[in-house]
Design a protein with these regions (language model features):
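Positively charged n-region of N-terminal signal peptides that target proteins for export
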Residues: 1-5
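N-terminal alpha-helical modules
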Residues: 20-168
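Cleavable N-terminal signal peptides
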Residues: 7-8, 18
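A broad, structure-centric signal for solvent-exposed, well-ordered loop/edge residues
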Residues: 8-9, 168
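N-terminal signal peptide c-region/cleavage motif recognized by signal peptidases
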Residues: 13-17
């Protein structure tokens, strides 16, 4: 909800020239939100929390430019989280592959399926966010839309892996 308010605020200042410097991004608010989150909806509500605080504190004030920079940092936070969760699930998949008793519906290992899934997901994320960005060509708001999309979808994938995509 907060990130949508952030995008609407950017639309309100759209005609203004973005002169703000990027704020100092601190992931603490997002980390705290995630620690207190109840379920997937709670986790989703945390996306953009630190980015909004960062943009509010930006030199020159809340602007499209500051929001874009801060959301890019939030994307980096969730990308790192995704990489950590992916490594955990990959390790679990490797362990399960060692225990495979031949009951799989095909001869492809769980680890290989995980890699295939993640590669396909990256293509999906990048295409989806490029499409969303394309709808706003001609202005800086498109950059914010793009990085917000990247952060949101990356966070969703991290949550999916963290909440145990293997169903165990």
């Amino acid at each position: 909800m907060m990130k949508h308010a952030m995008i609407l605020a950017a639309l309100a200042v759209w005609p203004q020239i973005a002169t703000a410097q990027e704020g100092d991004y601190d992931p603490a608010a997002t980390q705290s939100c995630l620690a207190a989150a109840k379920g997937l909806d709670g986790q989703r509500a945390c996306v953009g929390v630190s980015a909004e605080a960062c943009a509010d504190a930006a030199t020159g004030g809340f602007s499209t430019r500051s929001m874009t920079g801060c959301m890019a940092s939030e994307y980096g936070f969730f990308d790192e989280m995704l990489n950590v969760e992916y490594a955990k699930v990959r390790e679990l998949a490797a362990d399960l592959d060692k225990q495979d008793n031949g009951t799989s519906f095909d001869d492809v290992s769980m680890g290989d399926r995980l890699v295939q899934m993640q590669r396909a997901w990256i293509v999906y994320r990048d295409a989806t966010c490029a499409y969303e960005r394309r709808q706003f060509d001609g202005g800086t708001i498109g950059e914010l839309i793009h990085v917000d999309c990247l952060a949101t979808l990356t966070a969703e994938q991290a949550f999916r892996l963290q909440n145990n995509v293997l169903g165990l």
